């Protein structure tokens, strides 16, 4: 037999690359740094200023590195909207959960949202209302729905406890979201002084309006607003 006619094939094992915890952590930190840089940029100059190159410079990395995480500006803006939205909903939820009762939770949640929006009004406008691409706008709509759902949950809890009259909580929540956004950062919103006292008064007035709108009697609504912790939502700076 002519063994020279046989083809000898060597099987070389292929090592499957697996990211170590250190690599995963580093990637997550870089992702967070990019989002933080984009957030700071939007807070200063609006969403239109969120471009790959300046965000990369602010984050201290190369523009090519940003593209590895976000292939386009649209992807970066959508991720920024999602990150900020999630943080705001979480802050609102934690504040409301810490309140002693359902009506207090509703008041505290609304006040927290209002105070944080006023403290970062330019960023709030960029995330909520400034014109963006369709993809980012879709993420924005998800945020609005999440905000309405959070308020609706508080309304249902108050209705169940007998603290509010029966009502269509879904429509009421949607109406409150529209009123709050327009009253805080919309084109019809009046100019607001940066002085803490002026900010506090605005938050109290909007919270009072929201409570009255869903059926809280005026004395009770005023009592809830007065009881808002000064070191809580009204102290956001």
Locate each region found by the language model.
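C-terminal peripheral helix-coil segments that are non-catalytic and often amphipathic
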Residues: 1-18, 149, 153-160, 185-189, ...
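Generic hydrophobic, amphipathic alpha-helix propensity
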Residues: 27-39, 55, 80-84, 88, ...
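Helix-turn-helix
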Residues: 33, 41-75, 79
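Short, hydrophobic secondary-structure boundary micro-motifs
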Residues: 51, 124-128, 167, 219-224
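Hydrophobic alpha-helical connector segments
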Residues: 79, 90-122, 173-176, 200-203, ...
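Amphipathic alpha-helical packing segments from all-alpha helical-bundle domains
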Residues: 89, 119, 135-161, 170-185, ...
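Short linear capping/connector segments at secondary-structure termini
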Residues: 94, 126-134, 226-227
């Amino acid at each position: 037999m002519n063994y020279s006619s046989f083809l000898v094939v060597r099987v070389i094992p292929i090592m499957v690359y697996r990211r170590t915890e250190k690599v995963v952590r580093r990637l997550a930190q870089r992702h967070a740094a990019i989002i933080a840089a984009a957030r700071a940029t939007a807070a200063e100059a609006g969403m239109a200023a969120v471009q790959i190159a300046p965000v990369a410079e602010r984050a201290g990395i190369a523009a090519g590195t940003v593209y590895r995480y976000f292939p386009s500006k649209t992807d970066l803006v959508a991720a920024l909207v999602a990150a900020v939205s999630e943080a705001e909903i979480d802050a609102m939820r934690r504040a409301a959960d810490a309140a002693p009762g359902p009506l207090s939770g509703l008041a505290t949640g609304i006040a927290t949202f209002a105070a944080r929006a006023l403290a970062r009004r330019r960023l709030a406008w960029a995330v909520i209302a400034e014109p963006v691409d369709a993809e980012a706008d879709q993420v924005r709509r998800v945020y609005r729905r999440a905000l309405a759902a959070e308020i609706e949950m508080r309304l249902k809890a108050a209705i169940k406890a007998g603290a509010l009259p029966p009502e269509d909580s879904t429509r009421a929540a949607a109406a409150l979201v529209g009123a709050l956004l327009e009253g805080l950062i919309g084109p019809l919103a009046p100019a607001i002084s940066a002085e803490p006292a002026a900010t506090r008064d605005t938050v109290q007035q909007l919270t009072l309006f929201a409570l009255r709108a869903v059926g809280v009697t005026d004395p009770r609504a005023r009592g809830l607003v007065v009881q808002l912790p000064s070191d809580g939502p009204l102290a956001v700076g």
